[in-house]
A protein has these predicted regions:
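Residues at beta-strand starts and edge strands
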Residues: 38-43, 61-67, 87-89, 130, ...
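N-terminal onset of structured domains
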Residues: 22-65
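Ser/Thr- (and often Asn-) enriched beta-sheet segments in non-cytosolic proteins
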Residues: 26-28, 92, 204, 211
């Protein structure tokens, strides 16, 4: 049994025509109350990342979405700003086609935390994009600075597609010796085309707070 690349192309072509109607994306980094600037991290949240047609189509067909977050804490200097701390985490959303439910997990320092299983895509989106307080080191009192957030949403990458094919279908099986499965030139070409039709392997977003001084 071979991968159904015809289905993938159909999904990509259909999704490409619906991108203009997607929900507006928002990415927010919200500071705590002023009295807690040196005691609590900001709240990171987003909306609309998983709402466009291409992402929903891919999710409903068993392809996972990965949201990679990187929060940076900077201090403000007279001439230059200085990066003082970073914190990275991932949120992964996967649709179980057989069980007909969405699975949402957060991965921090290689530790996986389940955020729940949901029957609807909207519920899964709310869980994936809801407020999160990352455990980044906090500024000292009197230290002027700001937080900057970098977010990459992987709509579909070549490596992810290969992993999905192995995990969900068992069709790609690398040799035990460690050699890569050669596949076919046609298969690799179609997978590349699917990625391009979807608008690239990643979508990048940024957000930052205003400058503050605890």
């Amino acid at each position: 049994m071979k991968p159904n690349f015809t289905l993938l192309l159909a999904i990509a072509l259909l999704s490409a025509s619906t991108l203009g109607a997607q929900k507006k994306v928002r990415v927010d980094v919200v500071l705590p109350a002023e009295s807690a600037w040196a005691e609590e991290p900001p709240a990171v949240s987003s909306s609309g990342l998983l709402s466009d047609g291409s992402m929903r189509d891919l999710l409903s067909n068993g392809f996972p979405a990965r949201l990679h977050y990187r929060l940076e804490r900077w201090t403000s200097g007279r001439w230059f700003d200085d990066l003082k701390a970073t914190f990275d985490w991932d949120v992964i959303v996967k649709y179980d086609v057989l069980g007909k439910k969405y699975q949402v997990v957060r991965v921090v320092n290689k530790k996986v935390e389940s955020l729940g299983e949901f029957a609807g895509g909207g519920e899964a989106e709310n869980a994936a994009e809801g407020p999160y307080h990352p455990a980044i080191s906090l500024p000292k009192k009197g230290q002027r600075g700001y937080y900057n957030l970098l977010l990459d949403v992987e709509t579909l990458s070549l490596s992810d597609l290969d992993e999905v094919e192995r995990w969900l279908r068992g069709e790609l099986k690398p040799a035990v010796s460690g050699k890569k499965n050669p596949g076919t030139a046609l298969g690799r070409g179609v997978r590349t085309l699917v990625v391009r039709l979807l608008g690239g392997e990643k979508r990048h977003y940024e957000a930052r707070t205003g400058k503050f001084k605890p």
